[in-house]
Amino acid sequence: MTADNDTRDWTEKYRPVSLADIVGNDAAVKALRQWAETFGTGKKAVILYGGPGVGKTSAALALAHDMGWDYIELNASDVRTKDAINRIAGPAAMAGTFEGTGGRRLVILDEADNLHGNYDRGGEAAIINVIRNASQPVILIANDMYAMSKPLRESALQIQFRAILSTSVAKVLRKVCANEGLKCDPEALMKIAERTNDLRSAINDLQAAAQGSGQVTVADVSTGDRDVPETIFKVMGMIFRGKNMREALNATYGLDENPEDLIGWVDENLPREYQDDDLERGFEALSRADVYLGRTRRRQDYGMWRYAGFMMVCGVNRARRRHYGGFSRYSPPTYWQKLGRAKSTRVTRDSIAAKVGKACHCSKAEARSTYLPLLRFLFDKDEYAIRLSAQLKLEEDEIAFLLDAKKASKKVGEIYKKSRALIEEEIEEEIDLFARFGKRPGKPEAGEPRESLFMAGEEEEKPSREKSAKLDAFGEIEKPKRKRRKAPDGGAPIEDGPEEPGEAPMAAAMPAATESFGPAGAPAPQESPLPEPEKPPAAEDKCSKKQRTLFDF
């Protein structure tokens, strides 16, 4: 490949395509290839860890190329919240390829050791869940593996990528110069390789030196040295065992740690390095540093950080009077872990309280104070624990909190598994009920024999009048006609004939119109009409019509 019109960054332009192009980490490449070829028999995920620019991301992409796998990558520019991981990485790790050919899809998560900020809250737990349920290979890339939680480290195979030798870096730089048509001084290339700690930085420095010219000389690369960031472990060694306190103090300026964090590291590892009087003097200097930090917080005067840094570095360094041999493994402050565990416990407790409050129609505070102790008591019986876990849809960490047990314990796993099975059964019952909804019980399906709508032993009862009824031309019941005859006194004709079934004749039911209620031969007395009640005059109505309406109930 030549320069020509290709304006890409050289680190991307010369990124290795195959695993065979990865330099300086043959053992790591071999282990990575073996994991891919035997996928399905061991760990579902692998952690590639090491310093920046040693080929971790390039090895992951080259592996996908060599194995013929699709890949999806989440890097530092992506949002790594719990929801984002479950939405993107989760389906990608469980589904097939985009083409549906049945091949593998590689899920790559870069900077997996930086899932500790507020914006990535819940991301690490989501990654563990993705790995547990994955059917596709997953690669996690990290600079500091020990910044990741222990459950996450144990869920994956660990492969370390070491720093590349300067001779190997210079060899790659010579190939880049040849492809770009540059005249490069071998001494200049070696100088670039020695002053950088990684291949990516070396290629960037080479591109910067060759900008605007067709050659790279020693003068071009001697204009300045690259600032190399120090690691906290190296600085700890310089503080406790270094002979030059000025070098140790200058090394802290390259740390990505503030004095509030650095004093925690020194306080945690000081008893592992010093003994007796040296330990006493070291803690005395450390206490003076803490005084300055307290004044900084109270007065908001961050100029006092320099005094705190001087006491925690130079003061501790000069407290040593004798030499201590052996190897000491430095560790981060344990109170960070305690704070993390306490915070995780509070989050789990509040999550359970929110679910209980929703089910019991009460506030989260009331559920936390009233119902959580009752739940702990009920969870002593497995039957109640399973049913309550299914009803509240509790996760494993929530079940472990109520049982006061570890999340990885056998009992927690069994209760979680049985509760999920119970939830699935209820869902299936709801689906069956919904499928039967809307069907008429008396209407037979296609191909089924038609049955009566009435239960066995019941007979259809119809009104007796409908038994003898006839229908007219409009489909209505035709009433029987009555015969008309003349009255004996020449009055109005009288209807006679069949009555409705069950009806007595009209003449038998009512007295005759000419029947007398008085003595024989005397005419019936005439009743005088009752006088109608007089209406009150309008003047006496003291309430208006509107008022009468209001009080008229």
UniProtKB/Swiss-Prot annotation:
GO terms for biological process: DNA replication. Residues 503-513 have a biased composition (Low complexity). GO terms for molecular function: ATP binding; ATP hydrolysis activity; DNA clamp loader activity. InterPro entries: AAA+_ATPase, ATPase_AAA_core, P-loop_NTPase, Rep_factor-C_lsu, RFC_lid. SMART domains: AAA. Keywords: ATP-binding, DNA replication, Nucleotide-binding. CDD domains: AAA, HLD_clamp_RFC. The keyword Iron does not apply. Part of the RFC clamp loader complex which loads the PCNA sliding clamp onto DNA. Belongs to the activator 1 small subunits family. RfcL subfamily. HAMAP family: RfcL. NCBIfam families: PRK04195.1-4, PRK04195.1-5, PRK04195.2-1. This is Replication factor C large subunit.
